[in-house]
């Protein structure tokens, strides 16, 4: 049985989220949450929320599922749209600031 959760338009660069996502791929849910607890990155907050959401989705799909037996089968981070902003610079010019968004997908299996 598989359970899936998606967080879209997360206001964080996909490259930075992938660094943390690669660390927890293949681990059991409890073990992955422990790893995230001791990781000092900003990306742990949305990743933790998505993993807990996928775990809750699994319990809705099957009442008898034990969250300790679930493991992260797939976790991937895709690029979302890029918000373009301008920052004033010297001599009347402007520099483009690209604020990147991420889509995080987690698939759990037992």
Swiss-Prot record:
GO function terms (MF aspect): rRNA binding; structural constituent of ribosome
GO annotations of cellular component type: cytosolic large ribosomal subunit
Domain of life: Bacteria
Pfam family membership, one: Ribosomal_L22
Example of a GO biological process term: translation
Coiled coil: none
InterPro entries: Ribosomal_uL22, Ribosomal_uL22_bac/chlpt-type, Ribosomal_uL22_bac/org-type, Ribosomal_uL22_CS, Ribosomal_uL22_sf
Keyword field contains Ribonucleoprotein: yes
Keyword RNA-binding in record: yes
Protein keywords: Ribonucleoprotein, Ribosomal protein, RNA-binding, rRNA-binding
Similarity-based family: Belongs to the universal ribosomal protein uL22 family.
Subunit and interaction comment: Part of the 50S ribosomal subunit.
Function noted in UniProt: This protein binds specifically to 23S rRNA; its binding is stimulated by other ribosomal proteins, e.g. L4, L17, and L20. It is important during the early stages of 50S assembly. It makes multiple contacts with different domains of the 23S rRNA in the assembled 50S subunit and ribosome. The globular domain of the protein is located near the polypeptide exit tunnel on the outside of the subunit, while an extended beta-hairpin is found that lines the wall of the exit tunnel in the center of the 70S ribosome.
Protein name: Large ribosomal subunit protein uL22
């Amino acid at each position: 049985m598989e359970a899936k959760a998606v967080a879209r338009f997360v206001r964080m660069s996909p490259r930075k989220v992938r660094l943390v996502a690669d660390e927890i791929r293949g681990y059991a849910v409890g073990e992955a949450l422990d790893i995230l607890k001791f990781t000092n990155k900003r990306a742990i907050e949305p990743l933790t929320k998505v993993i807990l959401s996928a775990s809750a989705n699994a319990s809705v799909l099957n009442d008898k599922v034990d969250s300790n037996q679930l493991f992260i089968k797939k976790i991937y981070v895709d690029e979302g749209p890029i918000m373009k902003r301008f920052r004033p610079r010297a001599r009347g010019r402007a520099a483009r600031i690209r604020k990147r968004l991420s889509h995080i997908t987690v698939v759990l299996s037992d």
